[in-house]
């Protein structure tokens, strides 16, 4: 699995992520959900847990103990609680943010996580980026934001700047938490040589427990009006709903692979391109009207993608090297001696 080219996994992640919103929309009935959407993340975590367990079992049977490394020390295992805790806080901050700003403003502010990921990537993982790569990350944020901005004829342009200051502060916090969770997960995946499937098993075990805690909290909040969550967990589920669960679980597994064998920037590009792909697909599936902003956003993001990942010699003309310059001088000297 580790020998798989990272760009293949990144493209697959882009396709699956782009279909996430489409499948979720198709799972609705009469403009709403017949199922409890809070159960979807829980089942996705369980799916990832089962798949990781099966792959770990297979790896342990077919590989030697030297190639399949597992760290069971509690000091190491407990670190996997932190990403789940960050995501739990992030989800609550998301809901709080949406009480102050509208959906369009929230989506645009969400693009701050692109830049914050780059900053945390440098600060915490000590990974250096070239000036050209920093420019590419900035362009990616501009491109995704441009594609989401509506024209003044469709919605009030002033609405982007009329929210209370608390809304903007919470939006910045939300972007920071999202980036921090990704960066910390990458740190965990690369801090030792443990097999990916064992790391996933730890990550998704705590993820499942936190999702159970959320479902129980929802039951208490609503006074068990519809009964305990485990008695109605599959109520209203359709084939499309199960596809949403499988899609969400599969994207999670791909993200963890990228965290182990690539990095957060690759994931950011994959998810950003997925957003644009979703918009394009919506033109055909949901009669979404394409806009100039969407076209410009796609062009800018493609430019950013090329700037970040293309080999340097394809972007600029490389200067003459000292070695080549020395050869030129020798040639001139020889010619002068011949003439004399």
UniProtKB/Swiss-Prot annotation:
Molecular function as annotated in GO: pyrimidine nucleotide-sugar transmembrane transporter activity; sialic acid transmembrane transporter activity
Statement: the UniProt record of this protein carries the keyword Transmembrane helix: yes
Name recorded for this polypeptide: CMP-sialic acid transporter 1
Cytoplasmic topology ranges: 1-5, 58-78, 126-168, 218-238, 304-340
Claim: Zinc-finger is one of the keywords in the record: no
A cellular component term, taken from the record's GO annotations: Golgi membrane
Recorded family membership: Belongs to the nucleotide-sugar transporter family. CMP-Sialate:CMP antiporter (TC 2.A.7.12) subfamily.
Species whose genome carries this gene: Arabidopsis thaliana (Mouse-ear cress)
One GO BP: sialic acid transport
SUPFAM superfamilies per record: Multidrug resistance efflux transporter EmrE
Transmembrane domains' residue ranges: 6-26, 37-57, 79-99, 103-125, 169-189, 201-217, 239-259, 283-303
Keyword tags: Golgi apparatus, Membrane, Sugar transport, Transmembrane, Transmembrane helix, Transport
InterPro entries attached to this UniProt entry: Nuc_sug_transpt
Chain ranges on the Lumenal side, renumbered to this chain: 27-36, 100-102, 190-200, 260-282
Membrane topology: Multi-pass membrane protein
